Amino acid sequence: MSDFCDSGEVLAQKGRFYGVYLLCSQSLDARYRGKCYVGFTVNPKRRIGQHNRGCDFGGAHKTSRKGPWQMVMIVHGFPNNIAALQFEWAWQQPALSTRLKCYPELRRKQPRETHFDYNFRIVNRMLGIGPWHRLPLTVRWLESECERGFVVPLPPHVRIVSGKVAITAKQPEQAVASNRSLECHLCMQRVEPAERCRLLGCLRASCPLTCHMLCLASYLLGDQPGQYIPIGGTCPLCELPLSWAELLRRQGGFTETDQDSDDVACDELSDDVPDVDSDVEQQLTP
């Protein structure tokens, strides 16, 4: 699936989107043009506006007066803001990251390599190693002219797509159908009202499977010692092949929309998690 690229805007529910983005400077000043910046956001459209307006309007100090900036790609699908911020830091600091410091070729930009190519090479490697290679991540291209293939093959469950992101406060339709039981089919325990928003079911609409997220994860992991995030398996009821990434995407309130659909006033929405990134610019040598 990682070789497939679709297009169109994605509609993400407020409070459930965590992304790590890459900016490229379009400055007319040769000192800054082509430089890159990695950051974290819960609202990409709002964040790029902040960067281009300057630090007085919420942008980062390192990007002020070095733009205009273009957000060319974003990696999203992280389970929470902590996981996204850890990914952001490792992307910014490959020489210091515990996961990446064993790859000496990532420590610095190669001769004649652009800043964008260097950052792309880092994230390509990151997506293929733990713990990130087991997460249900999506690589989203925001600028078509920057799209390129991945030299290091990505895990098959990682999606490569293109199109913008809009954040909405609208609640998604309930993923758990009304005809499903109020007991977990795996642990046979009653589902408490507070747990219903975290239930998972089968990808087949006619299958009545209802499970706690942890119960289904444990079932799909089976005899994989030391692993905590499943990749996939089969439905315990109807035996349909299941992708853990797709289960979480459906549960997480993501909806694909047409490119010409109306934006959802994402600039006017306040988010539970602020756009606070580490404000670390890539220190690149010529």
Swiss-Prot record:
Ranges where the GIY-YIG domain occurs: 16-102
Tree of life domain: Eukaryota
Keywords: DNA damage, DNA recombination, DNA repair, Endonuclease, Hydrolase, Metal-binding, Nuclease, Nucleus, Zinc, Zinc-finger
Signal peptide: none
InterPro entries: GIY-YIG_endonuc, GIY-YIG_endonuc_sf, Slx1, SLX1_C, SLX1_endonuclease, Znf_RING/FYVE/PHD
Statement: the UniProt record of this protein carries the keyword Nucleus: yes
Subcellular location: Nucleus
GO biological process, one term: double-strand break repair via homologous recombination
Cofactor(s) of this protein: a divalent metal cation
Catalytic class of the enzyme: hydrolase
A cellular component term, taken from the record's GO annotations: Slx1-Slx4 complex
Protein EC: 3.1.-.-
A Pfam match: SLX1_C
Biased composition (Acidic residues): 257-280
Zinc finger (SLX1-type): 184-238
Region (Disordered): 255-286
Similarity comment text for this entry: Belongs to the SLX1 family.
Subunit structure, as described in the record: Forms a heterodimer with mus312/SLX4.
Function according to Swiss-Prot or TrEMBL: Catalytic subunit of a heterodimeric structure-specific endonuclease that resolves DNA secondary structures generated during DNA repair and recombination. Has endonuclease activity towards branched DNA substrates, introducing single-strand cuts in duplex DNA close to junctions with ss-DNA.
Name the UniProt record assigns to this protein: Structure-specific endonuclease subunit SLX1 homolog
Species name: Drosophila grimshawi (Hawaiian fruit fly)
